[in-house]
Swiss-Prot record:
This is B3 domain-containing protein At5g18090. It comes from Arabidopsis thaliana (Mouse-ear cress). Residues 133-142 have a biased composition (Basic and acidic residues). It is found in: Nucleus. Keywords: DNA-binding, Nucleus, Repeat, Transcription, Transcription regulation.
Amino acid sequence: MKNKAFGQIMDDAENPGFFKILRSADLSSEIMRGIPLNFIKSISEEELSAKMLLKVSWGSSWPIKICRNPSFYFMEKKGWDQFLSDNGLGNDEFLTFTHQGNMCFTVDIYQIDGKELLTPRRSATIASSSGRNKREQRNNIYKDVKEEEDIESWSESSYPGHKTAESTGRRQRLSLSNKKAKETEKSKKKKMKVESISYDSQDDSLSLVPEFTLTIKKSYLIFLGIPKMFEELHMPTEATMFKIHDPEGKRSWDVMYKFSNNQTRFCAGWIRLAKELGLEIGDVCTFTLIKPTEMLVRVSK
């Protein structure tokens, strides 16, 4: 049976379109990215050969390549995931796509409470106590968040075993200081290998299970920055959907992992996880990588 939440057509003679409901379990599937056949029939072959442009009410836009399988047309995964990630989507939002011509679509976003999203979602978290305009506030908060994450990603609390690995790496650097320059790369690889191992003092053994620990701050209730060291050692180098489980195995959440040169983070779907776990500022969260794209989260209040 066809899921009626995905890609249904909106009948308008002048501006045809379609809608989608963003179910977290299917955010990146071909079905979710699909374009209704009845809508495709109203588009010329020439238009279909071009990229489609998704434009939201505050002016931002995303070009997305159109792909095809034997059954239907759909949006390319990379561009679609970028659109979801940049707008923090993935919590049962209702989206309408209205065709304005030349494969340019106006996208209207309605939150789960029915309210239309008219400004970037993350701007709602910016403090309004000063007289600065919204753009200045948004730029400043992201600058502060990035600085906090850069500091925390290298702190001992951000990565179990980091203190031990750091001291071991320091001894290695001292012992290699008199060696030739051609051995530098080899020593870096050895240091990286040592730092990827965390020490478990309780059973006096080495644990190879990758994990990191973060203390929840205000920004982490919106999206979660991944510590730089952990990201370099264990995380994928492209946007990927992760499944995060609670310790009891009764609940799990699909969360979008966004990769870039400047910052890597969990975004679309993270707000829902934070709400349902009841995360608060000051909580300590430990994330254990149990599969390449699955994690276990433990929360200490």
